[in-house]
Each structure stands twice: as structure tokens, then as C-alpha cells.
Amino acid sequence: MEGHRKVELSEALALGPDWRHACHALLYAPDPRKLFGRIPMRFAVLMQMRFDGRLGFPGGFVDAQDSCLEDGLNRELREELGEAMSAFRVERSDYRSSHIAARPRVVAHFYAKRLTLEQLQAVEARAPQAKDHGLEVLGLVRVPLYVLRDGEGGLPAFLENSFIGAAREQLLEALQDLKLLDPGIIAKLKIPDSK
């Protein structure tokens, strides 16, 4: 979404019928484990490798038969992540933000859903059996929420990847607002320009 800008949900929902709505969700869970026995994981955060080679969040376009944004999002999550998604539902209370882009005329709505680590691991385990696995979705990845001693490995290296639309900005905003990442780490990050 070139030239995307953030808008309020009410403004996004008031746009005319020539606008398409897409919904995506950051799924996360507390993770008490430590990498190599010393680097706290804090949280597990899922993203996916998309068919176009970019990183993004699971979700997709809301269809005419979907009664609301969240129905469309939950349908897309089941298609992309499989039946483990039936154990919970992303609701309006999980809504975070909306971004619009004039070309194409798309509104991207962003949600964040907290799961248990067991629920998140079930999603990861069953995703390869999902309808869209190997097609729209090439695989799931966890976001490394740490910085290695060299100052480049972990999250800084992850952010160098190519992200779709506003996904990088949505990720960083959610990490900060949901307190999934130590604030000191965010302050030290060199955020690459959107690719």
C-alpha cells in the first residue's frame, strides 16, 4: 500500500463502495522460555511469508457475504492458518488501527489477539494443513523480540526484510503499545524505510 495513511475506524467504514476492506491480525502469546538459556523470549509473535515474498500478517479481504469485518477476518484466518483458529475468535475488542491507500483503494484494518502459548503452538502445528498453505501463505515465522550482542541480529535483522503495505509499522506500533518489547529496544532500533 504505497502512500498509506492511518485513519480512524469510523472514517474507514464511511468510505464508499468502491473501497475494499482487508483485515489482518497479529497473533501473540506470552513465552517464558529463554533462547540459549539466557535471552528472554518474552512473547511469541506470528507473521507469515506471503505468496509475493513479503512478510505480512495473516488475514485478507472481507467479502460481501461476511456480515462484519471480524467475520471476514476470522474466515480468512481459518483459510490461511487452519482449523486451530476455530478454538478462538478475533473480536472488535482486538482492533488496533486502520490504514488507507488511494491506489489501490484498499483499507487495511489491523487487529492483535493474545493467545496462550499452547493455542499459538497449535496454530503453528496445524497451519501446514490449511487450505491456503503453500499457495497464498508460504509459511509462518516468529518475530525475534530481542537484539543480539552484535546489535544487528534478532529484531534489527528481521526488520530489514520486505514487508507488505503498513505491516512493518503495524508490527512496531503493536510491539510498543502492547508492551511486547522492552521500550529500550524500540528506542535503539534503526527502522529501515519501507520497501
From Swiss-Prot:
Its cofactor is Mg(2+); Mn(2+); Co(2+). GO terms for biological process: chromosome organization; dITP catabolic process; mRNA catabolic process; NAD-cap decapping; negative regulation of rRNA processing; positive regulation of cell cycle process; sno(s)RNA catabolic process. InterPro entries: NUDIX_hydrolase-like_dom_sf, NUDIX_hydrolase_dom, NudT16. Expressed in brain, testis, spleen, lung, heart, liver, kidney and muscle (at protein level). One of its GO terms (molecular function) is snoRNA binding. Binds 3 or 4 divalent metal cations. Acts specifically on U8 snoRNA with magnesium as cofactor. Has broad substrate specificity with bound manganese or cobalt (in vitro). Mn(2+) 2 binds at residue 76. Pfam families: Nudt16-like (PF22327). Keywords: Cytoplasm, Hydrolase, Magnesium, Manganese, Metal-binding, Nucleotide metabolism, Nucleotide-binding, Nucleus, RNA-binding. PROSITE patterns: NUDIX (PS51462). Disulfide bonds: none annotated. Substrate binds at residues 24, 50, 57, 170. Belongs to the Nudix hydrolase family. NUDT16 subfamily. RNA-binding and decapping enzyme that catalyzes the cleavage of the cap structure of snoRNAs and mRNAs in a metal-dependent manner. Part of the U8 snoRNP complex that is required for the accumulation of mature 5.8S and 28S rRNA. Has diphosphatase activity and removes m7G and/or m227G caps from U8 snoRNA and leaves a 5'monophosphate on the RNA. Also catalyzes the cleavage of the cap structure on mRNAs. Does not hydrolyze cap analog structures like 7-methylguanosine nucleoside triphosphate (m7GpppG). Also hydrolysis m7G- and m227G U3-capped RNAs but with less efficiencies. PANTHER family: NUDIX T16 FAMILY MEMBER, U8 SNORNA-DECAPPING ENZYME. Homodimer. This is U8 snoRNA-decapping enzyme. It comes from Mus musculus (Mouse).
